[in-house]
Regions:
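Short, conserved loop/helix-junction motifs that constitute active-site signature segments
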Residues: 178-181, 211-217, 235-237, 344-346, ...
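N-terminal leader/targeting and accessory segments in enzymes
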Residues: 1-103, 107
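C-terminal helical cap/extension that packs against the catalytic core
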Residues: 53-61, 364-435
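Residue-level signal for inorganic ion chemistry
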Residues: 31, 78, 101, 119, ...
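Beta-strand->loop->alpha-helix junctions that form or flank phosphate-binding loops
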Residues: 42-43, 64-67, 102-106, 238-256, ...
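Nucleotide phosphate-binding/pyrophosphate-handling subdomain across enzymes
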Residues: 3-14, 24-34, 142, 271-376
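Phosphate-binding loop of NTP-binding sites
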Residues: 70-75, 82-225, 229-240, 429, ...
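Short internal beta-strands
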Residues: 37-44, 221-225, 351-354, 373-383, ...
Length: 467
């Protein structure tokens, strides 16, 4: 089916969206314009939807809100938001009753006429996706960037040409239901994550593996040789597999002990050519190089490495005040991301603002690293978390620190705040000239904010307001 045929088929169809997001609006507007009757279902009350709810009503969508939002699903097609569990009993019942249960990204994959590069993993997805997109743009390609990053892609599907490329970031929530794989699949790494939603680690890993399981012999898979869970996925690949490594020579991109980056035997550039800091960003570049090798030149790879400034909320420099440098690493939504990001960068102890919603992942290793790397730990936990998020991660982080074998009483100093303004104030009072302060939550922000980006924006505003 072509994109035009898909949109023509919507006339007279009843379509429901489960889970409200501003990203739904362009698609709902298009569906309405093509004669579909659209409803939107969300567990939150209509009042809690705020501006999003008002915008949906203006488009003519019927709102079904509250605890019974999944009752009586009898539409022709259901679009599941990524945050809505695929295996909800109500969705399984809908499937059994003949409802087509799908998602924006699944339909995009079904209709996309061009080559698709897709990136998943526990950490490094957005930077790797962005670097791939930048390299392909620099090589002269028209790039459609989306998924978990950028804008929704399905609303622009009719503008996508066969000679273009699509570059998408995919989460486990999106992948769990997908039955098509991209032309180029990248798994950056795998570690415990989102275990508050997935029933166990096996389900999480199996969801991630969907990015490669449906490839054919002409596909390409890129895997991290330094991460055991990721490297093991090589047993399930069907096309060409490239491994990347920061520790040893591989058939893909790898970095030598003296800081030179190669693809197989071919020299590309120096590790120091990469503008954005951190060993984890070297890994992100190795993954990106392995994904685009043969599609872009070495010159393009080097140029992007030297010029790309990175992505917002990823160890983003905010300002320097009174000799103290402030960074925003709000994207560090897991212990592993915190450890390979902010906590890997400095050979001196920093001031760290952490905390958020508990994803039911272990914090033991993070506790040890905090004891080694942090002088003051400011733990952020709201007095009243947002609906549905009862357990802040702050308590588990503190327990992991105090229970670490290398913890000494008072080192690190542990402080508590229930809002970002107070967290920034406490961090400033603790920091001395020459120090670094970083928002490095090691947890999602959903107990207080709509997203990690909103959390990072508020942190940035508070830091910039300091006098």
């Amino acid at each position: 089916m072509t994109a035009n045929e898909f949109y023509a088929s919507l006339s007279g169809k009843r379509i429901t969206f489960v889970g409200v997001g501003r990203s739904n609006l362009p698609l709902i507007e298009q569906f309405k314009a093509h004669g579909a009757a659209v409803s939107v279902r969300d567990k939150r009350s209509e009042a809690a939807l705020g501006e999003d709810g008002e915008a949906l009503k203006k488009l003519g969508a019927k709102l079904i809100c509250g605890e019974d939002y999944l009752e009586s699903i009898d539409e022709d097609m259901l679009f599941r938001a990524p945050g809505v569990p695929y295996l909800l009993p109500e969705l399984q019942k809908a499937r059994a009753n003949g409802v087509a249960v799908t998602s924006e990204m699944e339909v995009f994959f079904d209709l996309c006429p061009c080559k698709i590069y897709a990136v998943t993993g526990s950490d490094g997805k957005t930077t790797t996706t962005s670097v791939i997109a930048e390299m392909l743009k620099a090589a002269g390609k028209t790039v459609h960037l989306g998924g978990n990053i950028g804008r929704p892609l399905l609303p622009e599907i009719r503008d996508v040409k066969p000679e273009d490329v699509a570059v998408v970031e995919l989460s486990s929530f999106q992948l769990i239901s997908m039955r098509r794989s991209p032309n180029v699949a990248v798994i950056t790494n795998l570690s415990p994550n989102h275990l508050d939603v997935h029933k166990n680690m096996d389900e999480y890993v199996n969801a991630k593996k969907n990015v490669l399981l449906h490839q054919n012999a002409f596909g390409r898979t890129v895997l991290n040789a330094d991460n055991a869970l990721t490297a093991a996925c090589a047993a399930d690949t069907r096309g060409m597999t490239y491994m990347f490594s920061r520790r040893e020579k591989t058939n893909g991109a790898w970095c030598s002990a003296d800081g030179k980056i190669y693809f197989g035997d071919e020299y590309i550039m120096e590790e120091s050519d990469i503008r954005i800091p951190g060993k984890h960003n070297v890994e992100n570049y190795l993954a990106a190089i392995s994904a685009v090798w043969g599609d872009v030149s070495k010159e393009v790879i080097r140029t992007v490495a030297k010029e790309f400034n990175g992505v917002e909320h990823r160890m983003e420099f905010v300002r320097e005040l009174d000799g103290v440098r402030w960074y925003n690493d709000s994207i560090a939504t897991s212990p592993s991301r915190a450890m390979i990001g902010t906590l890997s960068l400095y050979d001196f102890k920093i001031v760290m603002i952490a905390g958020g919603a508990d994803k039911k992942v272990p914090f033991d290793e993070l506790g040890k690293v905090i004891c080694d790397k942090v002088k003051t730990l400011v733990l952020l936990a709201p007095e009243k978390p947002l609906e549905g998020f009862k357990t802040p991660a702050a308590g588990k982080i503190e327990a992991a620190v105090r229970g670490a074998e290398n913890y000494k009483d008072g080192a690190p100093v542990i402080l508590h705040a229930n809002n970002m303004k107070d967290a920034v104030r406490l961090a400033r009072e603790s920091a001395e000239p020459g120090d670094v302060v970083s928002l490095c939550p090691a947890a999602t922000g959903f107990d207080m904010y709509k997203s990690f980006a909103v959390r990072g924006d508020i942190y940035r505003e508070e830091v910039k307001a300091l006098k």
